Amino acid sequence: MKGNEEHDIQKELKRYELFFKKRYKVLYTVNDFIIGAMFLVGSFFFFYDRLMSAGIWLFAIGSLLLLIRPTIRLIHDFHYRKHVEQQFKHQSSTDD
């Protein structure tokens, strides 16, 4: 019986992990795409004196978005760890 419960918990953790990996992977990819677009457009803006200050702003915002990448990863890890701890608490309470 205990082996089945562990198997069920492992299955639940895998399902949860896949759900959150997909969700955060989309956020991460969208963020990367926006960063790339900002740096590309900012680079072209540097060819024109009129648009140079807008290009600087795009670089600054793109750099800020680079800081969001590890933040997304930390939030994902925090939520996943929280879920794992809850599963193990649930498992230990049913073992008693």
Swiss-Prot record:
Q: Which domain of life is it from?
A: Bacteria
Q: Which residues cross the membrane?
A: 27-47, 52-72
Annotated S-S bridges = none
Keyword Cell wall biogenesis/degradation part of the UniProt annotation: no
List the GO cellular component terms. Answer: plasma membrane
Instruction: Indicate where this protein resides in the cell.
Output: Cell membrane
InterPro entries this protein is in? YrhK_domain (IPR025424)
UniProt KW Membrane keyword: yes
- Keywords recorded for this protein, A-Z: Cell membrane, Membrane, Transmembrane, Transmembrane helix
Question: How does the protein associate with the membrane?
Answer: Multi-pass membrane protein
- Principal subcellular localisation of the protein: membrane
Q: Per its record, how is this protein called by name?
A: Uncharacterized protein YrhK
| Gene name linked to the record | yrhK
